[in-house]
Amino acid sequence: MNNNIINLIAAIILSLSIIFGWQYFVVKPEQKKQQQQIAVQKAENLKKQQLKALVEPATDIVVQEESGVQRIKIESESLTGSISLKGLRFDDLILKKYKQDLSNNSPEVRLFSPANTENAYFAEIGLVSNLSSVKLPNNDTIWNSDSEILSPEKPVNLFWVNEDGVKFLVTITVDENYLFTIEQTIVNNSDKELPIQSYGLINRKYTAVEKAVNILHQGPIGCIDENLKEYSYDDIKDKKSEKFAASKVDWIGITDKYWLSSLIPDKSSNYSSNFNYALKQGTERYQVDFISPVQIIKPGENFSIKSRIFAGAKKVDLLDKYEKQYDIKLFDRAIDFGWFYIITKPVFYAMNFFYGYVGNFGVSILIVTVIIKLLMFTLANKSYRSMKKMKNLQPEIDRIKNLYSDDKARLNQEIMALYKKEKVNPVAGCLPILVQIPLFFSIYKVLYVTIEMRQVPFYGWIKDLSAPDPTTIFNLFGLLPFSPPSFLMIGAWPILMAITMFLQQKMSPEPADPMQAQVMKFMPLIFLFMFSSFPVGLLIYWSWNNILSIIQQYYINKFN
């Protein structure tokens, strides 16, 4: 085999080894649950066109009713929680359909928490003015409500009147999923003009306890001027603030691996928006916010503006639905499908499609793998034939090398002439590898970032396709009463992957270069340890893909 081809294949293998070795040995695949505390915010001291980023924390907001302050209970198929009538803040939200782990007594996932709790995190929609004389609702305002429960069937109407007779009305609705709609109306019954600005903010206390996972974005995110803006927590911490003046803001928010909190402002105007960080009283606070231009409301006039808050699980079909229904640009990109988005999302659609028929994502992975294999059959067939031809030409290539060992230019010329004469493409054997690399990463991404794959079982001992195989050969798959260290957690599926990889190599033509042949023999063992911590769904794909390749190679050997 030509040295250039050997180098190319070796480079591909080395690149994969470096990428996944780094992931395994340096970057842990999951961030631990982060401890969060957050600040309560005030919005009265805003300058024109700019929302104050971070404010001092309050100490009087808890989930329970206090000092006579009631809460509006949120109750839907997907959500439970409450909204405080003091300050009208979304600071108590639980996702009913998701558990924190697979244990029987696992609590449900909590997204929002009040400001004086350990995991504080909340959203807020309100009004501000650049004139201090204008009396607006603030964090101490006690709103009046016509209902104690907010549900998809029953919106909540709130009102508050200031000392000048100006009436502030808020209507809150929630759908069956995770979208709140907040319509604010100002009725100017005073004899003065009111300069009003609408704002929204999401504030979170976040302290990283582990190094971030580089293959996944977590932190401030948004679509501004139809461009996706992503900033890690470290980015914002270093910059302190990232500002966007007078921009088209489709949505901004804070994303986790599976969960998203997002502000979706009214599309009637442009907005100034900010991604901010501050360290106050020993706590790290992150905030995303937007503020509208000044709207002058004349005496006797009304003004209404509608904003939305998404707070929930990043389900692909749900984000797609909202994106189309409300024209929210790039809303599906809150799911980090990565560089191969154009491949990864169709792969997910295919898996989800077959899941609708078979009811098991593991089986769906098997079906999609078969389809991919069929689509690539012709290419793989040509590749295998080319590899066999290259092996048959190796004696002649060795003769040419000996003949022109002192003349590299002539050597390459003669070898290329031989390829042309025998109609051999020297890179054909590499094409399936190059094509499968983005497919491999796409399937990995689907398993790693989509909520649909979280805590879903296969068969037998596999209860979560997005987690590593929980068994290990070092305690005889649970027969021995001890737990090996994590680097020895080599389960049945990693072993099956390595065995099928070894068998596939045995059926393939060996590399002509003895050194490369020796290296290839160790690859199944290297990959066994390297991939043991990867999602078991990926190992199911790889093992099944190897089995199909073995069948394909048997077919080619027999009939060609």
UniProtKB/Swiss-Prot annotation:
Required for the insertion and/or proper folding and/or complex formation of integral membrane proteins into the membrane. Involved in integration of membrane proteins that insert both dependently and independently of the Sec translocase complex, as well as at least some lipoproteins. Aids folding of multispanning membrane proteins. One of its GO terms (molecular function) is membrane insertase activity. It is found in: Cell inner membrane. Keywords: Cell inner membrane, Cell membrane, Chaperone, Membrane, Protein transport, Transmembrane, Transmembrane helix, Transport. Interacts with the Sec translocase complex via SecD. Specifically interacts with transmembrane segments of nascent integral membrane proteins during membrane integration. One of its GO terms (cellular component) is plasma membrane. The chain crosses the membrane at residues 5-25, 334-354, 357-377, 431-451, 476-496, 522-542. Belongs to the OXA1/ALB3/YidC family. Type 1 subfamily. Gene3D superfamilies: 2.70.98.90. This is Membrane protein insertase YidC. One of its GO terms (biological process) is protein insertion into membrane. The keyword Cell inner membrane applies. It comes from Rickettsia felis (strain ATCC VR-1525 / URRWXCal2). Its main location: membrane. It is a multi-pass membrane protein. It holds the Pfam family YidC_periplas.
